[in-house]
UniProtKB/Swiss-Prot annotation:
Sequence ranges of Low complexity compositional bias: 137-146, 154-179, 209-224, 240-290, 333-358, 372-400, 479-490, 704-714
GO annotation (BP), single: barbed-end actin filament capping
Listed name of the protein: Altered inheritance of mitochondria protein 3
Compositionally biased residues, Polar residues: 225-237, 412-437, 522-534, 605-614, 652-668, 814-825
Length: 859
């Protein structure tokens, strides 16, 4: 065998090495594959939720990007237009979507365009008007004074001519007659394309300043190329023939009031009004709207020239307009008047004849002088609907500058012609009055930042000022004497006035001067006042102690301070000589103090008298000194001559303590335990050694029992160390002659002990509990007379027959005999002392029912 290992050792080792190598590689591969499979299974089943959460976190982190890397909004193309929509780009060109029928959709939001100046603004066209006219289904809240009730059948179609708005610079006389007089169309055109006063109802404005600022920039861009020179503006104003004004006069009476406030404004006014309508949920009311100073000087010359040309023409129309019947909507809601520039005055005069026919003429878009337009908006008066004198304004009158809620680009009406004439007459004063008006530019910021900026900053108030100012009284609270402020309120109020200008108290609060304060007690100051006003408040201004409001008359209290407590929490009372004769060693209880709402005092030490002038310790505050409800001094030195109450007659007869032949040693235990007969059942007694040591002390106190001091003692719980042991139960072998009497309620001495007269027996708690709960032995029942050894059981009688009558008679006889036997056995139980009880008594014969005798059948 040794040769085999030597010859094949190399091959065996190489085989084992290769086998171990490939085995390890295979095991490793299988382990990796199993681990991957188990991990995949875990992620697909149990760990799927965790994987989703991690993927969500990764998505959120990747999606967050910087706004600076985003594309400029100016690079995006304008949004698509629906049929019938129009849009004005940033360069002023009008983009028309076509003459297709209008689609009743909501207006395009303009909030984002207003906030980003680079974006081309969307111009609200007639497409947005039908949605706004739907508001007329509700009772109109704010309407123009000349606006008639809505007409539902006039809201269906719009002619294509309404959508055509010529460029500024064109004159009204150059319009072709085909556009001025097209084919007859349904009369709803006036409502759809013209009647949009609900759009310009006063709306609270938050971004009104910024919107108007952008509109002014756009209008200025359009105004400069189309305006040219002031001469061109005059030509435009003068281009309207006066014949068009004369045509209005004979036809104004039936219909002019209907269309006075239904003129279609220019796209700029529509844009501004639409922006205000869309932002009504975020706007805030503003009483006056201002404009930048830069527009005042640029338009001053044009305003002056334009108004001078229009004023004589307007004055010619006033007599006819004043004779028109005023049609007002049946409502009491506040109405508004709006004024507009002279260009609108001329155009409305020239367009009035066309409104007589069911035709809408295209509207010229003139350059609007910004200064006059906004100034007249600011000076628009607020008048309720119940005033019929709107058309009776004189040219020389100037309306007060009272703007409705935010200044909106409201629709011009015919009634405002008189307002503009007043402006023309007082142009110089208007320019000078608005020279100081500026517009606060709108600053784009986040909504959270805006909320933080609009928060009302409250000035921090120190705690010292709060404590120094008294709270105000309710207006309905009476100022009776019971509710008058205390001295603390008065002193604090005076100090608060001198230190900080806090809120003044109500005049109805009666402040009384500070009452007298006990200067013997230390002045206490609250922590707030002590920390912050130590340098400001002197010793003479120290705040008095808090108390109940009202006048408090302090009087002397003669109660002494409580005695020092002992180790067991009860005050120690020294021995007193005025005790009862039978229990002279026991100190009597002092009389209780009168009943009061405050905690009562412990028992007063009678051997020490404290004068009524003695105060509490100086270091103790006033609140800790107990005071009785009944104020005044009580003289404890008065001698009371009442004799102690007599003893009950029973205790006098049965108590061995009254026996004159009883020795002193035999009376000691009875005297010691007499006063605590009932208290012994509540607490545990001390060891007997302490009782023995206290006997000589009681012996010395006994001669002083003849003192005639009165005050019958009241029952009081003694400490645990002074309680005696309870009387031990007497066994059956004790003689009946020495049985004690029942202790009376006057705590007479307990019985003497027969074993030892001087020292009571040792009290064992366990033994007493065992004897108390030990039951007497059970009584052994005696044997019956019939079951005794000398007696034989009775022989049952033979049954006569099996008939029912015989059986009944047998049962009756059996019951009678068994009842007699039972009575006899019960009577003999007391005489039989041998044997145990009969356990078969419950199986008596009368208990078992009688059965038929199948064996002894009668033959």
């Amino acid at each position: 065998m040794s040769n085999f290992w030597d010859n094949n050792k190399g091959s065996i080792m190489s085989g084992l090495a290769s086998a171990g190598k490939y085995g390890y590689q295979g095991t490793k591969y299988v382990a990796k594959a199993g681990y991957k499979a188990s991990k995949t299974h875990y992620n697909n089943s149990q760990g799927k939720k965790n994987v989703e959460e991690s993927s969500d976190e990764g998505y959120m982190s990747e999606s967050a990007s910087d706004l600076s890397h985003l594309q400029d909004p100016k690079m995006f193309p304008p949004p698509p237009l629906k049929p019938g929509q129009k849009q004005i780009s940033s360069d002023g060109t009008v983009i028309d979507a076509g003459n297709a029928p209008l689609v009743h959709t909501a207006a395009v939001p303009m909030a984002n365009a207003a906030s980003h100046p680079g974006l081309p603004p969307r111009t609200p066209t007639a497409n947005s008007i039908p949605m706004l006219t739907q508001q007329q289904t509700y009772p109109p809240q704010n309407m123009y004074q000349q606006q008639p009730p809505p007409q539902p059948p006039m809201q269906q179609q719009v002619p294509p001519q309404v959508q055509q708005i010529p460029q500024p610079g064109q004159q009204l006389s150059q319009q072709p007659m085909q556009q001025l007089h097209p084919e007859p169309i349904p009369p709803r055109n006036y409502q759809t394309a013209v009647e949009t006063p609900p759009q310009y109802t006063p709306i609270p404005s938050l971004n009104a300043q910024h919107v108007q600022e952008q509109l002014q920039q756009q209008l200025q861009q359009q105004f400069q190329p189309s305006m040219g020179t002031p001469d061109q503006g005059q030509a435009l104003v003068q281009g309207s023939p006066l014949a068009s004004q004369q045509q209005v006069q004979p036809q104004v009476q039936p219909q002019t009031s209907q269309y006075q406030s239904q003129q279609v404004p220019s796209p700029q006014i529509q844009n501004q009004g639409q922006l205000m309508q869309q932002q009504q949920n975020y706007f805030q009311p503003q009483l006056q709207q201002t404009q930048p100073q830069q527009y005042i000087d640029s338009y001053a010359q044009y305003q002056q020239q334009g108004q001078q040309q229009v004023q004589p023409q307007i004055q010619q129309m006033q007599p006819q307009v004043q004779q028109q019947p005023i049609q007002q909507p049946p409502q009491a809601q506040p109405q508004y008047q709006q004024s507009y520039p002279p260009q609108y005055q001329q155009q409305t005069q020239s367009l009035q004849p066309q409104y007589q026919q069911p035709v809408q003429a295209p509207i010229v878009q003139p350059p609007i002088p910004q200064q006059d337009y906004y100034q007249q908006q600011q000076q628009t008066p607020y008048q309720p609907a119940s005033q019929p004198q709107m058309y009776q304004q004189q040219p020389g009158q100037q309306n007060p500058i009272v703007s409705p809620a935010p200044a909106l680009a409201q629709r011009p009406s015919l009634s405002n012609i008189q307002t503009s004439t007043g402006h023309g007459a007082s142009q110089e004063s208007t320019v000078s009055s608005t020279a100081s008006i500026t517009v606060k530019p709108y600053v784009w910021m986040d909504s959270d930042e805006r909320k933080e900026k609009k928060k009302i900053e409250l000035q921090p108030v120190s705690a010292i000022d709060i404590h120094q100012v008294t709270p105000p009284l309710h207006k309905d609270r009476s100022s009776s004497s019971s509710l008058k402020s205390s001295s603390r309120d008065a002193s604090v109020l005076e100090k608060g006035k001198s230190l900080s200008p806090g809120p003044a108290p109500l005049p109805s609060r009666n402040v009384r001067p500070p009452t007298s304060v006990d200067h013997t007690k230390p002045n206490t100051v609250t922590p707030a006042a002590a920390t912050g006003t130590s340098a400001e408040v002197g010793d003479d201004q120290v705040r008095p102690n808090e108390s109940i409001t009202g006048v408090y008359h302090e009087s002397t209290v003669s109660f002494p301070p409580p005695p020092k407590p002992t180790h067991n929490g009860l005050p120690m009372s020294p021995p007193v000589s005025h005790a009862r004769p039978t229990v002279s060693h026991k100190p009597p209880n002092p009389p209780r103090p009168p009943v009061s709402s405050k905690p009562t005092l412990p028992p007063i030490q009678t051997h020490q008298r404290i004068t009524s002038t003695e105060r509490a310790p100086i270091g103790r505050p006033k609140e800790e000194v107990h005071q009785a409800a009944v104020l005044g001094a009580y003289n404890y030195n008065v001698d009371v001559g009442f004799a102690p109450p007599p003893k009950p007659p029973r205790s006098m007869v049965t108590s061995p303590a009254n026996d004159p032949q009883t020795s002193l040693s035999s009376r000691r235990p009875s005297q010691e335990y007499g006063g605590v007969a009932k208290a012994s059942s509540r607490t545990l007694p001390p060891p007997p050694g302490q009782q023995n040591g206290s006997l000589p002390q009681h012996t010395e106190e006994e001669p002083a029992s003849n003192s005639s001091e009165s005050a019958p003692p009241a029952m009081r719980m003694l400490p645990l160390a002074d309680l005696p042991p309870p009387p031990q139960r007497t066994d059956s072998h004790t003689t009946t002659s020495e049985q004690p009497a029942v202790p009376s309620r006057t705590f007479d001495p307990p019985p003497r002990y027969s074993t030892n007269e001087t020292i009571p027996p040792t009290y064992n708690i366990d033994e007493d509990i065992q004897t108390a709960h030990k039951k007497p032995p059970p009584k052994v029942p005696k044997k019956k007379v019939s079951l005794r050894a000398g007696n034989k059981p009775p022989v049952p009688k033979k049954k006569a027959s099996l008939s029912g009558t015989a059986t009944h008679e047998h049962n009756e006889s059996a019951r009678t005999s068994l009842t007699q036997e039972t009575n006899n056995s019960i009577d003999d139980d007391d005489d039989d002392d041998s044997g145990e009880g009969n356990s078969f008594r419950k199986y008596l014969r009368h208990v078992v029912p009688a059965e038929r005798d199948h064996i002894h059948k009668s033959k």
